Amino acid sequence: MRVGGGPLVTTRLGSLRGRRVVARSTPQAPYYSFKGIRYAEPPRGSLRFRPPAPLEPWSGVRDALEEGSVCPHRFMLFDTYKGDEDCLFLNVYTPALPDLMSGYNPQLPVMVWIHGGAFAVGSGNAFLYGPDHLVGAGVVLVTLNYRLGALGFLSLENEEVSGNMGLKDQVMALKWVQDNIEFFGGDPNRVTIFGESAGAASVHMHMLSPVSRGLFHGAIAQSGSATSPWALAKEPKNRAFELGRELGIDTNNTAELLGYLRATPSELLVKAAARLFGIAGKTADLQSTVALPFLPSVEPDIPGAFFTDEPKAYLPGADVPFLTGYNAQEGILLLRRLQRYPKLLNEIDNEFQRVIPPKLSTGGPEAVAKIVNQVRAFYFQQRPVDMRNIDSLIDVST
């Protein structure tokens, strides 16, 4: 519906005013944007570390003209803190709106983007992921924020803080899409979720989790899966206590730790979690998940749990069309780790097993040694692991 001041959409929770936008890619095909739409209550105070709380309806018209705050994280370009805990927003971009007067309803296919960033950084805002191309192809695009790092994935392995808050945020957003996307010209029966890296792992996890069943009808995972070695935290409770010690609280009491973490400003949590990157042991190991301290994890068997077993136990998952893949030389991200840990090349040269995926490192010592030698010979022949042969190492890590 068009009204003075911009397009108006009435959802099941209340009315929103958006903008009519001229696309940069196809100026002759304008679209409508509705930004900064809340899909859950702000997860602050007592709601920190809890599943998202349903949003209450409102009266009047809310502006949906600007993107909402991003969730707290370290901004990757400038390595600075950014965000606010009041961050559970999504954005909707649509090429056509229903017309109540004429009865016109476009019922367009819907794509929901789940951003990547190691479950620790990023947002769904248009800073990196603009809508013009997909909207120009006749798609209703939804992008979203979800809680990151400790705020999104810390687990005490109990009912109070069972973990996976960020994944549950995504579920809440998908429920919002099912309830409301028809008012933006989308078809709730043609929803495809897609994501990259941690977003791809999230997509695959939704295919496997019972709590996401029926919320989408197709999935695209770009460079990541639920079974990627970096996508699941082992012993997540220990990581929570490590975070407490990094913040100056040395306790073995779960309730005491939780009280402290709930009272700590989000900026301090984010910065302390960043210092945990690479703690303990061989922290530069290519397959180490310790370098990503807060990740999805297995939860206790409680109502609303996202996973109560490892993702592989849920395979094959939802019976929906699924597209997945990766790009050549994605392992170039390794160069950033080399900058932080210059001894890595020499360590890998001496202990090449460290680059072998865990799934190939099973069996007895002789079987593992044979696999290691075969992989090394395939990529390096007789050459050493050094900067002269960095392309080969990038290929291995890809």
What are these regions (language model features)?
Residues 200-212:
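Short glycine-enriched nucleophile-adjacent loop
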